[in-house]
């Protein structure tokens, strides 16, 4: 039985701090990585994801899809044997809240026009 490839990954946060590195199998999904990032999120950060849907992982300039595996996301030309892959973490709050907040803000405003003839 062949040994499954394992990949070392660390996650770079918005402020330059890192989570990891951790070792994952090439068959691990991006969804699994996001769960790990949310569960290991450092205490005291100003931006904290509420769930995996608010987390985006970026590797080699591409946003990774949840159903892809680590092996599928790995770029062949950028890897150094024994090196650690750095994935950038972006927290993007869900849009549903911000859309409803905008509607509430616009509702009480009224347009008032006046004309003055001199």
Curated annotation (Swiss-Prot):
Tissue expression per record: Ubiquitous, but three fold higher expression in senescing leaves.
GO cellular component, one term: plasma membrane
Topology class, membrane: Lipid-anchor
Keyword Membrane attached: yes
Residues linked to a lipid group, S-palmitoyl cysteine type: 113
Subcellular locations according to the entry: Cell membrane
Induction comment from the UniProt entry of this chain: Not induced by pathogens, cycloheximide and ozone treatment.
Alphabetical keyword list: Cell membrane, Lipoprotein, Membrane, Methylation, Palmitate, Prenylation
Protein origin, superkingdom: Eukaryota
This protein's record includes keyword Cell membrane: yes
Lipidation feature positions (S-geranylgeranyl cysteine): 115
Gene3D superfamilies: Phosphatidylinositol 3-kinase Catalytic Subunit, Chain A, domain 1
Predominant location: membrane
Residues that make up the propeptide removed upon maturation: 116-118
Every Ubiquitin-like domain range: 7-73
Positions carrying Cysteine methyl ester: 115
Any further remark recorded for this protein: Heat stable and remains soluble at temperatures exceeding 90 degrees Celsius.
Primary role: May serve as docking site to facilitate the association of other proteins to the plasma membrane.
Protein name in UniProt: Membrane-anchored ubiquitin-fold protein 3
């Amino acid at each position: 039985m062949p040994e499954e490839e394992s990949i070392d990954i660390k996650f770079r946060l918005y402020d330059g701090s890192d989570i990891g590195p951790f070792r994952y199998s090439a068959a691990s999904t991006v969804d699994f990585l996001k769960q790990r990032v949310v569960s290991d999120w450092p205490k005291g950060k100003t931006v904290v994801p509420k769930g995996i849907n608010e987390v985006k992982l970026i590797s080699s300039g591409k946003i990774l899809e949840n159903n892809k595996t680590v092996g599928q996301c790995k770029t062949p030309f950028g890897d150094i044997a024994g090196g650690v892959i750095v994935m950038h973490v972006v927290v993007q709050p869900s849009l549903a809240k911000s859309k409803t907040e905008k509607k509430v803000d616009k509702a009480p405003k009224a347009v008032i026009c006046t004309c003055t003839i001199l």
